[in-house]
Amino acid sequence: GGAAIPTMTESVDDVIIYLEFVPIDGPSGTVGSAGPCLTRSGTAQSLVGGMRFDTDDLETLDNFGLMDDIVLHEMMHVLGFGIFWEGSNLPFDYLELPSDPSNPEYTEGMTDTHFTGPEATAQFLAIGGDDYTGGEIVPVENDDSEYSTGSLDGHWRESVFDEEIMSTAANVDGDPMTIDNPLSVVTIGSFEDLGYTVDYGAADPYMQTFSVVLDPQLQAAELEPVIDLSGDVWRGPIHAVGADGTVRRIR
């Protein structure tokens, strides 16, 4: 995840996440980045990853009460959210129509990038997605006009999912009786699609009127503070580790 990873000699039966607080780009820029660096061979399940956070943004996150939400968001990237969705050396290919600016067929905000994992799809339909008319389901971020290119392909589409924790921006509504950035069953389902054992009971209450697609300018007019999380998906080298300790690069 950009964090410094020490030499390891121990056995890992779950996942190890290294954490680092460092200057990145000053206040109000990239708040952090995260991703896996080692995965279990033949799976899309992380073994070791890292998270780093910009020391110049910590006070802002703390003042907004967002630190826990941001850490959870970045942990999900370590587990493969937006990273293990597709790749020639991965067992799954769930990302359709990637929003890659280097692709001549990509049109900003128009290419209908979406996630096709069956569990996430079923959960999306279950919470109102059967009314979604904006394109294919489950919609993935395809527009970098409001946020940076780093938001593409690695988050749920902000204009559709709004405050959901794995959308492109973190929200603050100031109401202590509501959850600012809920963890939806769609996100949990996406991890089941990656092969993880999940608990849907851990989801927060979250329903959307998916037939309504929010215009970015209207979202900005809500005067609800948001923290831009684009650029937080670390897409560096990833290696797979076999049960015998054999290591090979897969990305």
Q: What are the functions of these language-model segments?
A:
Residues 1-72, 78-251:
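Extracellular zinc-dependent metalloprotease catalytic-domain scaffold
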